[in-house]
Amino acid sequence: MTVVGLIWAQSTTGVIGRDGGMPWRVPEDLTRFKQLTMGHPVVMGRRTWDSLPVGVRPLPGRRNIVLSRQIDFMAEGAEVFGSLEETISNLETEPEMWVIGGEQIYRLALPLATRCGVTEVDTYLLHEDDDVLAPVLDDTWVGVTGEWLVSCSGLRYRLHSYHRS
């Protein structure tokens, strides 16, 4: 059975996206993202796919899967499926997969996930109407939180690793 992991970066107020992108720059988070997802399928929604810079779309070294309800949607270099169930059945031989966004896909995958990798960026963002918010982890999740670190961009961040208890 394929292990389902979720990975995201969020502000201290739970914002993971704003205006079609991430509202901060923390290169160390991208390094961690690459370390955890490299060699594994990454599953994302169409808007997350569209938000990836053209130069790294599809994400290299990973099987890229885009979920879309739009029947004729095509994503060059990626596979497109209409549901998470269809995706998982096509990944049954894979040891693990990572869900990389967005909000709707996290919500669908959260009940199936057994691990989460979260980068918390020490920035306070008031919620705006179109913000994308991080999933809320309930008390079935147990986490380990690292110390605050300072990014080369000057922002403080810390890493959280969660698994189902």
Swiss-Prot record:
Q: Which InterPro entries match?
A: DHFR, DHFR-like_dom_sf, DHFR_CS, DHFR_dom
- Which residues are recorded as binding NADP(+)? 8-9, 16-21, 45-48, 67-70, 100-105
Group of enzyme by EC:
oxidoreductase
What EC number(s) does the entry state?
1.5.1.3
Name the GO cellular-component terms.
Answer: cytosol
Q: The DHFR domain covers which part of the protein? A: 3-165
Catalytic reactions on record: (6S)-5,6,7,8-tetrahydrofolate + NADP(+) = 7,8-dihydrofolate + NADPH + H(+)
Molecular function terms, GO-annotated: dihydrofolate reductase activity; NADP binding
- Tell me which Gene Ontology terms the entry assigns under biological process: dihydrofolate metabolic process; folic acid metabolic process; one-carbon metabolic process; tetrahydrofolate biosynthetic process
Q: Where does substrate bind?
A: 7-9, 29, 62, 119
Q: Where are the transmembrane segments?
A: none
Q: In which pathway does it act?
A: Cofactor biosynthesis; tetrahydrofolate biosynthesis; 5,6,7,8-tetrahydrofolate from 7,8-dihydrofolate: step 1/1
Among its keywords, does the record have Oxidoreductase?
Answer: yes
Q: Which UniProt keywords apply?
A: NADP, One-carbon metabolism, Oxidoreductase
Q: Does the keyword Ubl conjugation apply?
A: no
> Its function?
Key enzyme in folate metabolism. Catalyzes an essential reaction for de novo glycine and purine synthesis, and for DNA precursor synthesis.
Q: Which family does it belong to?
A: Belongs to the dihydrofolate reductase family.
Q: Give the protein's recorded name.
A: Dihydrofolate reductase
